[in-house]
Amino acid sequence: MKIKHTLTLILFTVISYSSCYTQSLNYGDISYNKAVNISGKQRMLSQKMSKAYLLMAKGVKDEKIKRELNSSKFIFKKQLQILKTNASSSSTRLYIKKIYKLWNKFDVLLSDTPPNVSTSKQIIDLNTSLLKACNDLVVDIEAKSNYDNKFFENNNQELVKIINVSGKQRMLSQRLCLYYIASVMFPKEKATYRTMLSKVFDEFDSVIGYLLINGYNTTESEEELGAIMAIWEKFQTNKSDFLDGKYNLVEVYSTTNAL
């Protein structure tokens, strides 16, 4: 299995492991575990799309990046529709409505061709609002799983945390690349973006150890996490160079995708 699939492997493992506990814990026609995973993936996609657009605007020519942007847009819209269709509470529907409102603006920006610096700046300014709205939905769905279905009576507190943290880690790897590009692309705002980059760097670094020692790991996922830690060490041991933008953009893109 390729390293870039490791967090997906962890999510699949913990969701499968918990199936005997969660058959009656549903978010509409899907389980709460799957709903947390899907809504968590929306966070990652918001950053992945932003990153891809900025890379193209910066002049990185790679058809893979263009395909990544287009497929991420399609998946984001499809998953948002799934979450909307299965939402039953008024609060959840309100969170989804807010995401749609932001997404409509965001989608227009992502569709602005050819990719350019001016639109890239607008994407940077809006991406955190979309990310926060997606995260608010994750938190709401987690709360519903606890309140409506007594989820935590099955001693699955750690399981829900692992699903959320694994999804968040996928988002952070994309956000790392996004703000690395922004710090290089917008020299006047470099200090601001460098501060954000440092914050994301530290948050990503702090979570890897937790994922490594959680009780739902398999031997395979532990080995893959070890491989991720080896890749991450390149940036971890040269944090100042990373924050100062001394790595090639394509290298950062490839490495963060592998994380």
Where are these predicted regions, by residue range?
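N-terminal secretory signal peptides that target proteins for export/translocation
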Residues: 1-2
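Hydrophobic alpha-helical segments
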Residues: 22-184, 188-259
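Sec-dependent N-terminal signal peptides
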Residues: 5-15
